[in-house]
Regions:
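Charged, low-complexity interaction segments
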Residues: 1-61, 185, 189-198, 204-608, ...
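Short, non-ligating residues that shape and space the ligands of small metal-coordination modules
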Residues: 132-133, 176-177, 212-213, 233-237, ...
Length: 752
């Protein structure tokens, strides 16, 4: 018999990538008809650039590898954790996690299949439990349910309700509620651990095979089955088949390695509960070119060192003209040297010419400086005297977590700078790709302002930016973002789960990929991708204020020459921190979830500062734009002291952020957004004392939905902005001075 082809449904792309992702239980409108989504082969390939696909595949590999490493630690368990308990078998090769690029297919979610699930029912009149073995036989079995009626088969109400409670396990399995349960039967006289799985489907007292499902009000703990014949009670109990196969032999007492029954037992949960399905995915900025991101390849470490050295002001090796000419000729760029020499000769002549204008001199000097800068970043890369910390960072970064990689952030910022921030590019209708909020374009100015009022408004904007310690703030249009989902877990969204019966032991949560779909001549796991192009705000903090803030709070920064920017020193500090188990940035930031356990380091503190400032802007923008908190995303560029906050969404960008900025402008206070951010009350918390004790970040103030946050709400603290406390992980235990406090001191000191 050919397999049943499931029906399909259409939902929005964002819903199909999350709430209706493959293997997600759902009910139709009105709560009737419980079903489960299944992978569908009819979705079209996502129109992504090859570099974007490769980056997504690398992120998935990194995510799964880190997940497995954390899940297999087995803290508090009495046996080693098998890798198959942490990730899908399809990800495992040679005893390691390997997500092959060829096993993935990148698709745009447009349609999804679904099947009825669970196939377990209860009589609305008497509570008799019935179930179907499979979809193929469900119709026939359902028609015979009334034959099992314990009262009057002829007068049976034949009115059945689908049970909306399922049995779930952190292995990723979901099963219908059933009176049958599995157990491990040890072989008598066989070798240690020998045995098999057996199922008990009948009453232990009378061997009856019909049961009532009793559902008293209250928690699921009160639910139970009752034998129709003898009324013997049977608890709701099931053991996960996959885990029982693996750990069943370890259930016997007296063994050196032993499993707990609680590791194997499934749990009853509501079909609609979030614990039934946690979708896993990520997002990344989409760029047009990979000139700078291409330097991140392992084969280009020397060029990457040269880029960082040039970008952050490390001194260059002095090359003679003959050496520079030779290198450029070898690279096929000799004509550039000829042009450079010609411009240099002209400059020398003009400098000795009476009446030469400063504008002419500056133009010639700028041409020479630009040529030298370009050469230092490309053909002369690797000849800079980069500090050992920079070389270590470029060499060791292959072991770092991608989203916390300061070197990658530097390359991404350089790309963003060239493609979006500077250069005066337009997107059509005269709109520029990015606009400095100190110098607004016609599309961001409030209507009806006189030139005098406009000048006053921009003056007030500048004043508030100074009070916030912001050196540059821009509205950026057409921020390219790709969001994707690739897998799921049950019962818990993190790599481990704890239960009271195990007294703190951490059990592994299995990360599963979306089920395979047909692709040409084979099958592959779908990665559901959604590309977006929306507005955002780019913010860069003042380097001098950040440096003073670190110094006054006793946070050491690696020593460097006077011309070396703070960003280079932060990269060095981050590289050093990655070698310290107490302060490294692991995938799930376990180090920073422990109270008072991490020393003060510049990398962690600046990351927390930028992250907190980004959340502060998100909460204010959400309140003033009408967008909910989950409609925002964030990206940090720590070495450049910058962050990007943008609108997430697959619907057409209606210019919510630009409209908000335009409508909130006023000559008296510049702009409501900045005025609100400056106002101390915007960072007060309704749970002030409790929040401060927990590090200064809670749902009442800074936390946003985890799906929108870069770190799932770690490395946040109001104290980095306003003082009056310190982050929960800081082991110094003395309150810090807030960044806004120092910025305000400087702004007031410089006020006319």
């Amino acid at each position: 018999m050919s397999p049943i082809k499931p029906p399909t449904m259409v939902r929005s792309r964002s819903q199909l990538g999350s709430a209706y992702a493959p293997h997600h239980p759902f009910t139709f409108e009105g709560g009737e008809g419980a079903c489960m989504t299944v992978p569908w082969s009819g979705n079209r390939d996502a129109a992504l650039k090859e570099i974007t696909k490769r980056t997504i595949a690398e992120q998935i590999q990194e995510y799964c590898e880190a997940w497995a490493a954390r899940a297999t630690q087995g803290t508090g368990l009495r046996h080693p954790v098998d890798l198959t308990q942490a990730v899908d078998q399809s990800m495992i090769s040679g005893g390691a996690v390997r997500v092959r690029y060829g096993d993935l297919v990148f698709q745009t979610p447009e349609i999804v299949g679904y099947v009825p699930f669970p196939l377990a029912f209860v009589c609305k009149r008497c509570g008799l439990h019935r179930s179907c073995d499979s979809l193929k036989t469900a119709e026939k079995e359902f028609a015979n349910f009334h034959a099992a009626c314990p009262n009057d088969r002829q007068g049976c109400a034949n009115d059945w309700q689908q049970i909306d409670v399922v049995m779930a396990h952190w292995s990723g399995d979901l099963e219908p509620l059933t009176p049958s349960y599995r157990h491990w039967h040890a072989s008598q006289g066989g070798p240690p651990g020998a045995g098999e799985i057996r199922t008990i489907s009948t009453c232990m007292s009378c061997s009856g095979d019909r049961f009532y499902l009793k559902r008293p009000p209250g928690s699921f703990a009160g639910w139970h089955f009752e034998c129709v014949s003898c009324h013997t009670v049977r608890p709701i109990l099931q053991r996960d088949r996959r885990t029982l196969e693996l750990l069943g032999p370890l259930l016997q007492a007296g063994q050196t390695t032993q499993a707990f029954p609680a590791e194997i037992n499934m749990e009853p949960i509501s079909y609609r509960a979030s614990a039934a399905h946690y979708t896993h995915g990520d997002q990344l900025l989409v760029f047009d070119e990979d000139r700078w991101l291409g330097l991140l390849a392992e084969s280009r470490i020397q060029e990457l060192c040269g880029f960082l050295a040039t970008q952050y002001g490390y001194p260059t090796t002095q090359l003679s003209d003959a050496e520079r000419e030779r290198i450029l000729r070898e690279q096929g760029r000799h004509q550039e040297w000829v042009n450079y020499k010609g411009s240099r000769d002209v400059l020398r002549m003009v400098e000795n010419t009476p009446g030469a204008t400063q504008q002419m001199l500056d133009g010639l000097r700028g041409t020479l400086q630009q040529a030298e800068k370009d050469w230092n970043e490309t053909v002369f890369a690797g000849r800079q005297q980069a500090a050992p910390g920079i070389l270590e960072a470029c060499t060791a970064r292959s072991r770092w977590i991608r989203r916390y990689d300061f070197v990658r952030m530097a390359a991404e910022h350089k790309t963003l700078e060239e493609e979006k921030l500077h250069g005066g590019r337009e997107i059509g209708d005269g709109k520029k790709v990015s606009v400095d909020v100190r110098v607004l374009d016609p599309f961001l100015k409030p209507d009806g302002l006189s030139p005098a009022d406009e000048a006053r408004m921009l003056e007030q904007v500048s004043r508030r930016l100074d009070l916030l310690g912001i050196a540059e703030m821009r509205l950026v249009r057409n921020v390219g973002v790709c969001e994707y989902t690739f897998g799921y877990t049950r019962t818990e969204s993190k790599p481990t789960v704890q239960r009271d019966k195990l007294q703190g032991a951490e059990m592994p949560v299995k990360l599963r990929l979306h089920g395979r779909v047909k692709v040409r001549d084979g099958a592959a796991h779908p990665v559901l991708c959604i590309e977006q192009s929306n507005e955002g705000f780019y913010v860069r903090l003042d380097e001098a204020i950040v440096l003073e803030w670190l110094t006054r709070n006793g946070v050491a920064v690696p020593a460097a020459g006077p011309d070396v920017a703070l960003g280079g020193r932060l990269i060095e500090d981050f590289a050093d921190a990655q070698n310290d188990n107490a302060s490294r940035f692991s995938r799930f930031l376990d180090e920073y979830r422990r109270d008072r356990s991490v020393p003060r380091r510049a990398a962690a503190y600046v990351f927390t500062l930028l992250h907190t400032a980004a959340h502060h802007l998100i909460t204010v923008a959400s309140a003033m734009s009408g967008l909910d908190l989950s409609s925002f995303g964030e990206h940090l560029f720590v070495p450049d002291l910058a962050f990007l906050v943008y609108r997430r969404g697959t619907t057409m960008d209606l210019g919510n952020l630009s409209s908000m900025w335009r409508e909130r402008g006023h000559p008296s206070f510049g702009n409501d957004v900045l005025d609100r951010m400056v106002n101390p009350s915007s960072l007060r918390c309704g749970s002030e004392s409790v929040c401060n004790q927990r590090g200064g970040a809670c749902p009442d103030c800074l936390l946003i939905p985890e799906s929108a946050c870069l770190t799932r709400n770690e490395l946040l603290s109001r104290s980095v902005l306003i003082g009056r406390g310190l982050p929960r992980w800081d082991d110094v235990r003395t309150s810090i001075i807030g960044y806004f406090e120092i910025a305000a001191e400087r702004a007031l000191a410089n006020a006319p």
